[in-house]
């Protein structure tokens, strides 16, 4: 049975379901540790399942009975779930909306830098500790609610050394950002890489270097 994580046994099930997983093995345990008593997060565990709910979206590690999972998500008001379909059958009656791809890089390895406009790069300023709100506004310029949620989450992780974000400035404008938003369990989950529309395709994002 899927139940809210409220006991040591539930927590152990949750963490066991996440163990050894790419991305989910970092993000879900970290979120449980930091936000288990915060809204809008909710955390649930089954015998072989870890489930994180935030708003109308769920993240799942491990697997569960498809019928039980479908009923539970409907009860919780979820509209979408992110899962590894090689491990977790989709909830009964649900259809796949899109495929998300995860790329992994082994510890100690590095990717080659792509070609970039060096003249443009020379006019940019690298900020290794950008304001959380500046990053939030760059990522969600038209959604103040998402800005506030992102700001709160990033500040919580940063103060505990669990997130690292860089940004590029062109004058007074944040034109590119990328971050490791879950530093946990020997993983660094990188996400929210975004470049301002007029500068996309110029190799800027791949040039972050310290």
Where are these regions (language model features)?
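Conserved acetyl-CoA pyrophosphate-binding loop and the N-cap/start of the following alpha-helix
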Residues: 68, 198-199, 203-210
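Acyl-donor-binding surface of acyltransferase catalytic domains
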Residues: 50-121
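A short, aromatic/hydrophobic, helix- or strand-capping loop or linear motif
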Residues: 24-32, 81-85, 145-155
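Short amphipathic alpha-helix that is part of the acyltransferase structural core
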Residues: 1-27, 110-149
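Short secondary-structure junctions
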Residues: 2-4, 39-42, 92-99, 122-126
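A mid-sequence, solvent-exposed acidic-amphipathic segment
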Residues: 133-189, 194
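A structural preference for long, well-packed, hydrophobic secondary-structure segments
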Residues: 2-3, 12, 192, 197, ...
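Conserved donor-binding loop and adjoining core beta-sheet/short helix segment
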Residues: 16-76, 175-191, 196-197
């Amino acid at each position: 049975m899927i139940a809210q994580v409220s006991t040591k046994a539930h927590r152990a099930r949750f963490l066991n379901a996440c163990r050894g997983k790419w991305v989910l093995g970092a993000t879900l345990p970290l979120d449980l540790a930091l936000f288990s008593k915060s809204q809008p997060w909710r955390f649930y565990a089954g015998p072989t399942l870890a489930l994180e709910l935030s708003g109308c979206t769920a993240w799942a590690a491990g697997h569960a009975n498809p019928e039980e999972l479908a009923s539970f998500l409907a009860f919780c008001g979820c509209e979408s779930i992110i899962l590894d379909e090689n491990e977790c059958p989709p909830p009964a009656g649900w259809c796949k909306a899109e495929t998300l791809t995860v790329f992994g890089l082994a510890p100690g390895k590095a990717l080659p830098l792509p070609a970039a406009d060096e003249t443009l790069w020379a006019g940019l300023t690298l900020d290794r500790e950008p304001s959380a709100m500046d990053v939030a506004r760059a990522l969600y310029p038209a959604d103040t609610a998402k800005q506030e949620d992102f700001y709160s989450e990033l500040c919580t992780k940063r103060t505990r050394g669990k997130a690292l974000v860089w940004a590029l400035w062109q004058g007074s404008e944040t034109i590119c950002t990328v971050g490791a938003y879950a530093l946990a369990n020997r993983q660094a989950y990188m996400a929210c890489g975004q470049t301002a529309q007029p500068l996309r395709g110029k190799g800027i994002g791949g040039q972050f270097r310290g």
